[in-house]
Design a protein with these regions (language model features):
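ATP-binding/phosphotransfer module of carbohydrate and carboxylate kinases, centering on a glycine-rich
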Residues: 8-10, 15, 19-136
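Short, intrinsically disordered, charge-biased short linear motifs at domain edges
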Residues: 1-4
């Protein structure tokens, strides 16, 4: 795992400060034991605690995105469980990313995934479907 916060939160992998400990969907829901959908509804309703957690999450995600952009200089597609909820927050996230990126003046390289759920399963299925079609 990539370290986001040296000496930070303990990650399930055993290390401390991994990006996963700060940017996984569980960061948003573990304390309240609610679903991600319930959490995002609270954010929409401007629930104080949910908004605070969301802003911290977006800040950590922005740092991670900026680091990845600096390292790889390529488009970044945001997926996973949270990716399906990011479309309405891309302007805010893009602005946060720009705070950490002194070399670029826009975040057009930042994209939201097309598949809102189970994107990896769709990708695997697509691979085998294409292979099958070639045999016809």
């Amino acid at each position: 795992h990539m370290i986001l916060v040296p000496g930070g939160k303990k990650c399930y992998c055993g290390k401390q400060g991994c990006a996963d400990a700060y940017c996984a969907a569980s960061v948003l829901t573990d304390d309240t034991k609610e679903t991600l959908e319930q959490f995002m509804k609270k954010v929409e309703e401007q629930d104080g605690q949910a908004v605070k957690v969301w802003k911290e999450y977006l800040n950590n995600l922005a740092i991670l995105i900026s680091n990845l952009r600096m390292a790889y200089d390529m488009d970044i597609i945001l997926g996973g469980e949270v990716g399906g909820y990011l479309a309405d927050h891309m302007i805010t996230l893009g602005k946060k990313v720009m705070e950490y990126n002194g070399f670029e003046h826009d975040a057009r390289y930042l994209k939201v995934c097309s598949y809102k759920r189970e994107a990896s399963a769709v990708g695997v299925a697509k691979h085998y479907l294409q292979a099958f079609i070639k045999t016809l």
